[in-house]
Amino acid sequence: MEANMSFENDYYSPIQLFAEIEAYANTMDKSPDLDILRTIEEFDETLLSEIEVRTQSIPSPLVAPSVTKMSLPSPSPAPPNSLYTRLLHELDFVEGPSILARLEKINVDLFSCFPHNKHLYEHAKILSVSPSEVLEELSKNTWTYTALNLNEHGEMALPMPPTTKADLPSYVDDIQNFYLGELEAREKSYATMFYGYCRALAEYIRQSAIKDLRDARVEDKNIGACSKARQYIAERYYREAARFAKLLYVHLYLSTTRDVSQRLEASQMGRQNIFVYLKCEWLQERHFHCLFQPVIFNHGVVIVEGRVLTAPELRAQNYIRSEFGLPLIRCKLVEEPDMPLISPPPFSGDAPRASVYLLQCIRSKLEVYSLSHPPNPQLHVHKEHVHVQKLESPPNYGTTVEALLMDSSDRNSISPGDPVATTISTL
């Protein structure tokens, strides 16, 4: 197999590169010859000796599931910055702001493949874009809790690598289903926690409005308080709720992906020979860039959007994974001898950033209730919501997008999320 993919240096003329890709593609369309089979059978995973790289991955990952991690009780009303600091410590995520800052320096879509799990937000009236509806929810105990397990697990057990190549496609499908189950189980707890913080934030804002009216000359204090509270909610609540959501959901995606990926690394490490038979094809580049990947030791054929994955692309993706504490993806056919496993990807200030894809994923959750219970049937969002930008204005990819809701038909909008789509076959 190596004979068909030779990477001797960093430079290829267009003719050389096309010839190698064509030869490689032709090989994939035919039955493996004796030399290929011999290479597969003689594959030695010791060739993949660990190369010291800058990574935050936890060493010696275990196959066992992560232990229970209980939250604090739902927070009491407090200023936004105090609630944000509490959330940082409750998640044990002090590096959260620096991670969010890194997402501003990456042009890769890491998040749009994650499922939106909209069914978890259908009844979240506390997220309504109508300030009046938000205020109505403050008197209810729906959004309070005693403790939540932030390391909830799905119903599936971690699938183990197969012993025969015929079982590889079903194994990859099982891994993806396992991950989606783990993610949804945790997201239920994270969503409940988010509602608790939103309630505490909204109640603090309501109390601030009442306090500001105490010395005001208003004939009807009750009417004045209601009007002032709606105004304060419109001006402050949505911006701060979005800030909480960014921190909370980036932690959800990173912690779940780290835990599952480390377990996969441990379970697949001793059975790397079987993955030489794997042909993995990502139909879209964003599928390859997704934070979660079902195969850590992808030693077979790797195709992205119909072309062979290159070593520089693999190094750039592994650099991003190392930045976020994820195991590196190892590809024996792609890696170049005597070259580092990681290198920084290029960056353009004019291109979409990873932070924007994260915000789009979050927005899809925050908008669920209001889209299914619109205050005004003629509008996607309520006029009370002052942070909604004009839809005809193009999004500013270099800054936080403040609108919680955007027109999904907008041609400039980011592709909706979906599970990782991968075409799997065997050689």
From Swiss-Prot:
Chief subcellular site?
A: virion
Q: Which Gene3D superfamilies match?
A: Alpha trans-inducing (Alpha-TIF)
Which UniProt keywords are present, listed alphabetically?
A: DNA-binding, Host nucleus, Phosphoprotein, Transcription, Transcription regulation, Virion, Virion tegument
Instruction: State the Gene Ontology BP annotations.
Output: DNA-templated viral transcription; regulation of DNA-templated transcription
Q: Where in the cell is it found?
A: Virion tegument; Host nucleus
Q: Which Pfam families does this chain map to? A: Alpha_TIF
Under InterPro entries, the record lists: Alpha_TIF, Alpha_TIF_sf
A single GO molecular function, which one? DNA binding
Q: Where are the transmembrane segments?
A: none
Q: Which domain of life is it from?
A: Viruses
Q: Name one GO cellular component term.
A: host cell nucleus
- Annotated family: Belongs to the herpesviridae tegument protein VP16 protein family.
Role: Transcriptional activator of immediate-early (IE) gene products (alpha genes). Acts as a key activator of lytic infection by initiating the lytic program through the assembly of the transcriptional regulatory VP16-induced complex composed of VP16 and two cellular factors, HCFC1 and POU2F1. VP16-induced complex represents a regulatory switch: when it is on, it promotes IE-gene expression and thus lytic infection, and when it is off, it limits IE-gene transcription favoring latent infection.
Name of the featured protein: Tegument protein VP16 homolog
Question: Which organism does this sequence originate in?
Answer: Gallid herpesvirus 2 (strain Chicken/Md5/ATCC VR-987)
